From Swiss-Prot:
Fe cation 1 binds at D21, H23, D63, H202. AMP binds at H23, D63, N93, H94, H202. This is 3',5'-cyclic adenosine monophosphate phosphodiesterase CpdA. Induction: Positively regulated by Vfr in response to elevated intracellular cAMP.
Length: 272
């Protein structure tokens, strides 16, 4: 069953921050492809705190954990706490639902519908336990339909982990959302739908599909090279996406990356 809350906006617009694909571990100093993922998240959070003094909602868009441990999820909560803003998260293909739920107890972290300002944010679980690609099950599509139908005059942003459109990377496109047409068919009659936001691809993505803005964010750790045929790491730094959602339905967004730290990365790795 989905939960639903109203989060007061700070002014006539809404400021969201997307933190994606942090790939945290239980152990201090653990590394993914040579990068200390807790250290990189900490530096991204420090940058967010400097650049975004008032945040209405933080979205952690999947792959919060690399090892699926309870400690990795509590680590994320601890490292993101300095931002002092409402946080919601959902699972990616590397996450484990049971520890993620345990880390959520006593909070609204897994809440799937959040009304903030003149917008409704709907968060869906596209993960398939034990698999890399994604799929939106009927219960998630039904939740989305109900959320849209009950949104009134609000504009909508919908977020999940897996990419619903090709991104031009031969190795990544087969591991995106397996049933994107079901999603787009559901969304087609609703002009108040303004944005789809996802993670998974570890790179910036910004396209338009009719009235829909299609957006993805860099990872807070390692980056994947756009347009690559095989697994390839990019040399861009970790970062985050900010989104300003205006009451009239306009959306402004941008990417910011850590530019004052040199991170150690194993660029010769052929996968993970």
């Amino acid at each position: 069953m989905s939960r639903h809350s109203n989060t007061p906006a700070t002014d006539a617009s809404v400021l969201l921050v997307q933190l994606s694909d942090s790939h945290l571990f239980a152990e201090d100093g653990a590394r993914l492809l040579g990068m200390d993922t807790a250290h990189s998240l900490e530096k991204v959070v420090e940058r967010v705190a400097r650049e975004q003094p008032r945040i209405d909602l933080i979205l952690a868009t999947g792959d919060v954990s690399q090892d699926g441990s309870l400690d990795s999820y509590t680590r994320f909560r601890r490292l993101s706490a300095p931002l002092a803003a409402p946080l919601r998260w959902f699972a990616g293909n590397h996450d484990e639902r049971e520890p993620m739920q345990r880390a959520t107890e006593g909070s609204d972290l897994l809440e799937q519908i959040v009304d903030v300002g003149n917008w409704r944010v709907v968060l869906l679980d596209s993960s398939i336990p034990g698999a890399v690609p994604g799929y939106l099950e009927d219960d998630q599509l039904d939740l989305l339909r109900r959320a849209i139908d009950s949104a009134g005059e609000r504009f909508l942003l919908v977020s999940f982990h897996h990419h619903p459109v090709p991104i031009g990377s031969d190795w990544m496109d087969p591991i995106g959302l397996r049933n994107p047409q079901a999603l787009f068919d559901l969304l087609a009659p609703y002009p108040q739908l303004r944005c789809l936001l996802w993670g998974h691809i570890h790179q910036e993505f910004d396209r338009q599909r009719g009235p829909l803005r299609l957006l993805a964010s860099p990872s807070t750790c390692v980056q994947f090279a756009p347009g690559s045929s095989d697994f390839t790491l990019d040399r861009l730094a970790p970062g985050y996406r900010w989104l300003r959602l205006h009451d009239d339905g306009r959306l402004e967004t941008g990417i910011s990356r850590v530019d004052d730290v040199v991170f150690e990365v194993d660029y010769d790795t052929a996968g993970y």
